[in-house]
Amino acid sequence: ESMPAIERWFRLEWMEHTPPLYTSADLRNAGFKLAPVDTNLFPATFHNLTPEMLPLAVQAAMAAIEKICPEARNLLLIPESRTSNSFYLQSIQRLIQVFTQAGLNVRLGTLDESIKVPSPLPLPDGGELMLEPLVRNRGRLGLKDFDPCTILLNNNLSNGLPRVLQHLHEQYLLPPLHAGWPLRRKSKHFDSYEEVAKKFAKLLGMDPWLINPMHGHCGKVDFHSASGLDCVRDNVEATLTKVRRKYKEYGINEKPFVVVKADNAAGAGILSVRDVKELDDPEKVARGRSACSSTEEGQEPSELIIQEGVPTYERMNDAVAEPVVVMIDRYVVGGFYRVHAERGIDENLGAPGSSYVPLAFAGSSQLPKPGVKPGASAPNRFYMYGVIGRLAMLAAAYELEATDPDAENYE
C-alpha cells in the first residue's frame, strides 16, 4: 500500500544525493526485523545475476554513464590484484559484459606492478580476460593507446592507497578512493544508515529499529594485550541491553546476540556474543582475535564495530540463507540468496562452503500485489528486500558525502 509514497521518497532523496555507481547489501530477515548487516561498495557478485536480470543491469549502467560522462567511449576497469578466484573472474566478466552492452569499450588495468605486458587470465568457460599494465600520464590514467573518461574501481584497496590512483582530477574515479578500506569505516556507514532509517521510518510511521541494526564502535583494540577490550565489553553490554529492551517491547522470545567484527576490512571474520561474560574467557577472546584478523590481508584489526545480531529465518532447501541485493546506480538489478548448510541462524554465512541461489527480482510477475499481507507473497518480500537494499545504498551515498576528504573544495 505504501509503494507510491516509498518510491516518491526515494526519488526526492536521489535529487539531493548521488548513488554509488554500484552497491551490494547483505540483508538478514528475522521475520520481526529486516535489516542490512553489510554494505559493499566494490561488489564481486555480478556472476550471481541470472541472464533475465542482465537487461536491467545494462539499463542501469547506461543511466549511470549518461549522468557521469555522457560522451564516454572508454571505461577502464581495475579489478582486485589477486585475481585467481574463478568466481571473482566470472563477476568481472559479467561486469565487462554489462558495460559493453551499455555502449562502452571496456578494458582491464591492473594495480599489480609486476605485470609489465598484457597478460591473459583464463576463465572457467574457456574464454579469457586480458589484464594490462596501467599508464599514468600527468593527471590522467589509462592503458597504452587507451584514454578512458571513467575509471571503475572493483578493488577495495585493502593493501593501501596506490599513488597511481591519487590526484586524478581530469577523470572520474568510481567509487572514489575514500570508499576503499584504508579510509572507510563500517561504523560510519551504519551511522549514516541510522539517519536514513529514521527518515524512512518516519514516512511510514514505524519504529526504525525494525529496519536498523544497533551498533557501537571501538577504536584501538589490541586483543594481545587486552587493552581496549573494556570498550568492547561496554559496547557489547550496552547493545545487548538495548536489544533485550526491544525484544521485550515486541514480545520476542529470543536470546539477543551481538557480532563483533573489524570496522575497516571486508573479511568474513566475526565473533558472536550472547553474554558479556563470554569476553572473560581467554579462548573466546583468542577466537575473536583470529576471526577479526582473518580479514582479507590478515592484518590485526585495531578498530571494531559491535553490531546487533539479526538472526535469519530464511531457508533454501533446509539450509540457512540470507538475501543479497545488487544495485547499479539507484536501481536494484538483481539479487541472490547466500546459503550455508552448516551454519546456524545467528552465524556468518559468508564463509567457505557457502553457495548462491539467484533471486528472480526481475520480471513483471514480481511486482508487489496490493492488498496482500506484507511479506506474505514472494513478490512483496522481494520488493521489501529491494527497499532495504536501496536504503543501504542511500546510506552509502550519505556516508561518502560525509567522509569525502575533498568536500570543502566543492563548497
Explain the meaning of each model-derived region:
Residues 216-231, 257-285:
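Glycine-rich phosphate-binding loop of ATP-grasp-fold ATP-dependent ligases
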Residues 1-4, 225-231, 290-296, 300:
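Short, compositionally biased leader-like segments
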Residues 1-17, 199-209:
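Short glycine- and acidic-rich boundary segments immediately preceding or forming the N-terminal edge
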Residues 28, 33, 238-245, 250-257, ...:
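Phosphate-binding site of ATP-dependent enzymes
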Residues 14, 42-76, 340-411:
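C-terminal active-site "lid" helix and adjoining low-complexity regulatory extension at the edge
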Residues 26-31, 41-43, 81, 133-135, ...:
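Short, flexible loop/turn elements at secondary-structure junctions
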Residues 59-60, 83-255:
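Conserved N-proximal alpha/beta basic substrate-recognition cap immediately N-terminal to
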Residues 17-46, 261, 309, 321-333, ...:
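Conserved metal-phosphate-binding beta-hairpin within the catalytic cores
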